[in-house]
């Protein structure tokens, strides 16, 4: 596996010269990311990735060095990959190794999960065995609310909240198709992943948040070796080294 992105092998991971990003007002402090306004640019924000990992809705925390940069660079590559395929995202640029420049959105309080292989909560709450292929993939919705432990929502409940889930589902399945094709080239199974969406000031829907192993499950084909946050959840290995492996592979295929 490779070294720290942006240090010992900068050209392998990113081709741009890092810039100094001056943060303005903090708009939102998440578990592992911070969102900042930009002076004189009301339609744009900076999204800063921290060297931090959490599990259990923040009940378990660690601060692995290099994790923020790695997730940021993976997200930049995958957002660019989606944009090239006609999927609208909040991504604009990656001005620094740990910071994205993004469109300012009103985030929809619903997390969208796409499942291709059974793992995680679907195994814990049903009789489905881990590793079972799910074809066609299923799309689930969860309320974005840590205090309520992000409960599962039905399609109708999302509609009762005043949100039409259909456009999000359609985009999520498009993202799934494109990610599956990409990860298959890398010898990786895309088990499942979480997406967030938001509206811009014109009411247009955009893919938001991040695209990284922090919000995906990635297994090596044939062995089920993990390259995602389950390594931290299950205390099975070094997530930064696993994430760097994914970043190195992505650079060869996107």
Please describe what each predicted stretch is.
Residues 5-15:
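Juxta-kinase regulatory segment immediately upstream of eukaryotic protein kinase catalytic domains
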Residues 15, 19-143, 250, 254:
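Active-site loop/lid in soluble adenylation, ligation, and acyl-transfer enzymes
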Residues 49-50, 116, 206-213:
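Short beta-strand elements
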Residues 59-69, 148-171:
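Short histidine-centered catalytic/ligand-binding loop motif
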Residues 92-97, 185-199:
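A short glycine-rich, hydrophobically flanked beta-strand micro-motif that places a catalytic Asp/Glu
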Residues 114, 190-209:
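Conserved metal-phosphate-binding beta-hairpin within the catalytic cores
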Residues 161-191:
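A long amphipathic alpha-helix within ATP-dependent nucleotide-binding catalytic cores
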Residues 211-254:
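C-terminal helix-cap and adjacent tail motif
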